[in-house]
């Protein structure tokens, strides 16, 4: 691939970690990875309170176990997804096929947009359940900072994942333009739609015409050499 495609150089080059960490989409992946840790870590550690009267734990978000479960599930899965695509970022320059690079970038667009949607749903869900929580369920305000942190970083994650989708779409547009020649170019000699294929005979002797090509004697030139006499029988 001349000049590379889809945001990376030619395949087979040496791995450059410094160039990798400077990529905007790689930076956003690391930030999203950290945000996911904050979300599910906050809920797991301080999102469940002990009830003295009931003798069992309950979710800090309006006693709704689904709210805590959603936050933990989205956080853990986003954490794993970030690791997967960080590994893909490392391997991406080694992909030699333009079609495979295109598939990787398209999957990045779809997955990032999908996670931005999931974080939006999670933010709205947790914020709503936190708003309707009853003060009597938590009179000592235990874990309130962690609950707010999970909501805040769910909100921030919407933009980090949406940013990844936008950057992946830009890579797709740039890559499609740079890969256009390599995908659509056809050698004229192999194109069956052309009426004829050009042919140039290499020159092996002097050029009497001075035109830089070969010289051929016209077919109707008078031949002065005797060809012999054939007698006819009468």
UniProtKB/Swiss-Prot annotation:
Summary of the function given for this chain in its UniProt record: May play a role in regulated exocytosis. Modulates the localization of synaptophysin/SYP into synaptic-like microvesicles and may therefore play a role in synaptic-like microvesicle formation and/or maturation. Involved in the regulation of short-term and long-term synaptic plasticity.
The species this protein was found in: Pongo abelii
Family: Belongs to the synaptogyrin family.
Name of the gene: SYNGR1
Listed GO CC annotations: melanosome; neuromuscular junction; Schaffer collateral - CA1 synapse; synaptic vesicle membrane
Sorted UniProt keywords: Acetylation, Cytoplasmic vesicle, Membrane, Synapse, Transmembrane, Transmembrane helix
BP GO annotations: cellular response to leukemia inhibitory factor; regulated exocytosis; regulation of long-term neuronal synaptic plasticity; regulation of short-term neuronal synaptic plasticity; synaptic vesicle membrane organization
Renumbered residue ranges of the record's region Disordered: 192-234
Signal peptide: none
Cytoplasmic topological segments: 1-23, 93-103, 170-234
InterPro entries (alphabetical): Marvel (IPR008253), Synaptogyrin (IPR016579)
Acetylation among keywords: yes
TM region positions: 24-44, 72-92, 104-124, 149-169
The protein, known as: Synaptogyrin-1
């Amino acid at each position: 691939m001349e000049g590379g495609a889809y945001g990376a150089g030619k395949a087979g080059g040496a791995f450059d970690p410094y160039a990798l960490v400077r990529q905007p989409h790689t930076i956003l992946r690391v930030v999203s990875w950290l945000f996911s840790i904050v979300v599910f870590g906050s809920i797991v550690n301080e999102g469940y309170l002990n009830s003295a009267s009931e003798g069992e734990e309950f979710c800090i978000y309006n006693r709704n176990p689904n709210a805590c479960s959603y936050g933990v599930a989205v956080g853990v899965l986003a954490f794993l997804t970030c690791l997967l695509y960080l590994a893909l970022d490392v391997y991406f320059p080694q992909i030699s096929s333009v079609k495979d690079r295109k598939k990787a970038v398209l999957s990045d667009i779809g997955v990032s947009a999908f996670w931005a949607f999931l974080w939006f749903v999670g933010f709205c869900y947790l914020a709503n359940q936190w708003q309707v929580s009853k003060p009597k369920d938590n009179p000592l305000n235990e874990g309130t900072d962690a609950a707010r942190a999970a909501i805040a970083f769910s909100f921030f994650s919407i933009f980090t994942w949406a940013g990844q989708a936008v950057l992946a779409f830009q890579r797709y547009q740039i890559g499609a333009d740079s890969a256009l020649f390599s995908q659509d170019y056809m050698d004229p000699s192999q194109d069956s739609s052309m009426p004829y294929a050009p042919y140039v005979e290499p020159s092996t002797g002097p050029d009497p015409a001075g035109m830089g090509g070969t010289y051929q004697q016209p077919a109707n030139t008078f031949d002065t050499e005797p060809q012999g006499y054939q007698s006819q029988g009468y």
